[in-house]
Amino acid sequence: MFLILAGLSCRQRVAPVEAEVRHLVSVSKPKEVLYLDRLDNRVVMAREDTVGQTMFRSFLVGLRDSVVVTDADRKREREKYLQYGMQQDWTAVVGGDSLKPVFMQEKPNLGGELRESALVFEVPRGAEADTLVYRDTYGDWGTQVFVLNAIK
């Protein structure tokens, strides 16, 4: 009897479990998640400038948004912001200096709810971004401060 039950239990299918994705830093609210991960510069561009006095530090910025927008004008404004305006809402604090990104490029074709972009800062050689600040001028994220110097 025991062998029959053991044999039957091995054939039962187990529902697949989705692994929870962990990010360097993330903040969430109902139906939305904003996250940040480090990104290898070679994915986006060169590691350093031509003179060699500065280096690039890249981050992957993700926005998962399941809020449905039905107004066509609002959709257009949102797209314009995500592609062109969001870059200017980011600031890196590096050794007490505030730096704006030099480049932001969206990853194409990720699906309706997920948007990811490579965000690149030019920093002095050997320096790291201590903090990234996001001041949302479009939506309702407000000001988000991502302290990175304690996260290695």
Task: Give residue spans per PLM region.
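Conserved functional micro-motifs across diverse proteins
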Residues: 10-152
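Sec-dependent bacterial lipoprotein signal peptides
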Residues: 1-12
